[in-house]
A protein has these predicted regions:
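Active-site rim recognition segments
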Residues: 15-25, 29, 33, 109, ...
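A mature extracytoplasmic/lumenal domain signature
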Residues: 10, 115-117, 148
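Catalytic cysteine-centered active-site loop
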Residues: 73, 79-80, 113-122
Length: 181
């Protein structure tokens, strides 16, 4: 029940290369019951959005901007699948991340969901729980936040877990952060 102090410094050095096995790549490319990247509707939106672009980072930029524009920011709209998000066109960060995952995978970009904390000034300076994505560019994972229309997210994003939010559920409501400057 003591305090842990964590100092964060923004490091502009590119992350180290992280080779993925074929099995790992397949895991982050495959459709799931929630991430319906193999559905005709998801494929059509993905193909229309990326067009003839082949660079995975540029594809991700196009997709995350499309998700940002498509979804009305509404914390009271919960969807369980990417197709529901596409149909309702509303939601919070979880819906943005869910739809982005499906569109990215449909475009052949390995992607995963990330859970963590995000700093914001509104309504007052503090950290909020947040969900965003990472794409694999063939060498390393790169953060993408379709809720805020950001590729290479800023230092205000504190990643806590990849994909499995259940593993960190016990932390919800227990983390306290004091912003010193």
């Amino acid at each position: 029940s003591g305090w842990t102090t964590l100092s964060l410094t923004r490091d502009f050095k590119a992350p180290d290369k992280e080779p993925l096995s074929k099995e790992q790549l397949q895991k982050f490319l495959k459709a799931t019951p929630a991430i319906q990247s193999d559905s005709p509707e998801i494929k059509a939106v993905s193909e229309r959005t990326v067009g003839s672009e082949t660079n995975p980072i540029k594809k991700a930029e196009l997709l995350q901007s499309a998700v940002f524009e498509l979804i009305d920011k509404d914390v009271n709209r919960n969807s369980n699948t990417a197709l529901e998000v596409l149909e309702r066109k509303a939601g919070d960060c979880t819906e943005h991340a869910l739809l982005f995952n499906a569109l990215a995978r449909a475009a052949g970009i390995p992607s995963r969901e990330v859970t963590g904390l995000m700093y914001t000034q509104a309504p007052s300076p503090q950290f909020y729980w947040h969900v965003w994505n990472e794409i694999y560019d063939g060498e390393r994972w790169i953060s993408v936040d379709p809720t805020w229309d950001e590729v290479f997210v800023d230092a205000g994003h504190l990643k806590i877990a990849n994909e499995d939010t259940i593993k960190i559920a016990n932390s919800f409501g227990k983390i306290k952060i004091e912003i010193l400057s």
